[in-house]
């Protein structure tokens, strides 16, 4: 389980990215790099990091399910992810 503070910080970053998305797009189109650099650092989408919705783990993230590999495995074995079953051939 990730620290709550890290998960909250990531949510704060997501809100900032959404808030400044239009402004950033306009400034990039104009080529106004000075104004762009004066925006908050956390408003840049490059600073976002995907986190597992269950555990908050930042590594081993599966985009399609929004889960880390560990949480995915546990939930898949329990049959809680629709359409996912263990492979056998």
Curated annotation (Swiss-Prot):
Entry keyword set: Ribonucleoprotein, Ribosomal protein, RNA-binding, rRNA-binding
One of the GO biological process terms: translation
InterPro entries assigned: Ribosomal_uS14 (IPR001209), Ribosomal_uS14_bac/plastid (IPR023036), Ribosomal_uS14_CS (IPR018271), Ribosomal_uS14_sf (IPR043140)
Pfam family, one: Ribosomal_S14
SUPFAM superfamilies in the cross-refs: Glucocorticoid receptor-like (DNA-binding domain)
Record-level GO cellular component terms: cytoplasm; small ribosomal subunit
Tagged with keyword rRNA-binding: yes
One GO MF term: rRNA binding
Purpose of the protein: Binds 16S rRNA, required for the assembly of 30S particles and may also be responsible for determining the conformation of the 16S rRNA at the A site.
Assigned protein family: Belongs to the universal ribosomal protein uS14 family.
HAMAP family assigned to the protein according to its UniProt record, in alphabetical order: Ribosomal_uS14_1
Assembly description: Part of the 30S ribosomal subunit. Contacts proteins S3 and S10.
Name of the protein this chain belongs to: Small ribosomal subunit protein uS14A
Taxonomy of the source species: Bacteria, Bacillati, Bacillota, Bacilli, Bacillales
């Amino acid at each position: 389980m990730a620290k709550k503070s890290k998960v909250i910080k990531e949510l704060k970053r997501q809100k900032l990215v959404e808030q400044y998305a239009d402004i950033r797009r306009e400034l990039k189109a104009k080529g106004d790099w000075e104004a762009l650099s004066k925006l908050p650092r956390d408003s840049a989408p490059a600073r976002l990091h995907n986190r597992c919705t269950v555990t908050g783990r930042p590594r081993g993230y599966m985009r399609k399910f929004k889960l880390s590999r560990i949480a995915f495995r546990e939930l898949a074995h329990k049959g809680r992810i629709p359409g996912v079953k263990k492979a056998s051939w």
